[in-house]
Amino acid sequence: AASAVASASKSQPTPAISQFYSVVREETRGLPDRTVYRPADLKAVGPDVPVIVWANGGCRHANVFFATALSLLSARGFIVIADGAPEAVSTLSTAGGAQPQRMTEVIDWVTKSKDAKKQFDGRASGTRIAVIGQSCGGIEALVAGADPRVDSVVSVNSGLFANGALGYGRDRLNELHSPVLFIHGGPEAIEYQNSVENYALVDGPAALVGAVGAGHAGIFYGIRDNTQDGTIAVLEEGVTVLVQWFDYTLNGNSAAKAYFTDPSGLSSVPKWTVETKGLQP
C-alpha cells in the first residue's frame, strides 16, 4: 500500500480531529461476524475513505464493549471494521487464541469484494488501511501488520510476549513495515512491560504512549485510577490519540504528527506520556 506519510501533499487535509460525522453501525455484507462503523454519508467524507480494521480484547469476536470508542473514531472520517457481528455480546475465539488471519480476511474483503464496493459505494480506500487491537487484539494487529497492504499498526494495552504466548513471538516485529503505535495504561498496567519492550524492538517509525492510571482497558471504558464512577475525559483523550495517529499515518497530515512530537501536543496533556522514534514528516 502507498504510504500516506511518505506521499503527503503540500496542501494539508482538514484535520480529522476537527471533523465529526453521524455514524452508522451495521453488518458487513458477504463477510460473516464483522461490524462496520462508518460515517452515514460517505460522500461527504470523500472518494477514498481510510479503513481501520479492529480486533477485540480477550480474543473475542464481539465488539460491543468498544462501541463508543469505535463510533467516536469513525465519526472523524474513517471506516472502522470490527471483529464480531453487531449483535454479538461475548463470543470467544473457537481457536482459543489470537487469530490475526481474521484481520487480513477483512482487508481481502475491502479490497476485492463486490459486496464491500457496493456497501461503501466504492469509497473505501484500498491503499490507506490500518490494523488496531486491544490486548489479544493488539497481538493480532502486530502480526497482521506484516501484510503489505497495511499502512499503520496500533497495539493497545498489548505487545508480543518474549515466550511466544498466544502463538506468536517477538520475531514478528521484524516483519512490520509501517509506523507502529503502542499504547499502555501506565506503569501499573499488566501490559506495560510488554508495550515498552516491543517499542524498543521495533526498528521502524514508532510511538509509545501511556495513559497513566488507565490500567488495562480504562481508555475504552472511561476509567482512570480505579474510579468506579468513570472519568470520561480519559476516553475522549484516548480517542483523540487514535484520531491523530490515523490522521498522520493514513491521511498524511503532518499537523497530526506534531501531536506526538511537539511539546504542545500530547505531552502537555495531564497524565499522558509520549515517546517517539523515526516519525517522518
In which residue ranges do the predicted regions lie?
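Hydrolases whose catalytic domains are alpha/beta-hydrolase-1, hotdog thioesterase
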Residues: E140-A144
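The feature captures the conserved acid-bearing segment of alpha/beta-hydrolase catalytic domains
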Residues: D151-I219
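Short amphipathic alpha-helix adjacent to the substrate-entry channel of hydrolases
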Residues: N63-D83
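Hydrophobic beta-strand anchors of alpha/beta hydrolase catalytic cores
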Residues: I52-W54, V80, L208
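Alpha/beta-hydrolase-fold serine-hydrolase catalytic core, especially in secreted/extracellular enzymes
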Residues: G213, I223-P281
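Gly/Ser-rich "nucleophile elbow"/oxyanion-hole loop immediately N-terminal to the catalytic nucleophile
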Residues: D41-D48, L92-I139, A255
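N-terminal cap/lid segment of alpha/beta-hydrolase-fold proteins
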Residues: A4-P47
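Short beta-strand element of the alpha/beta-hydrolase
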Residues: G46-G57
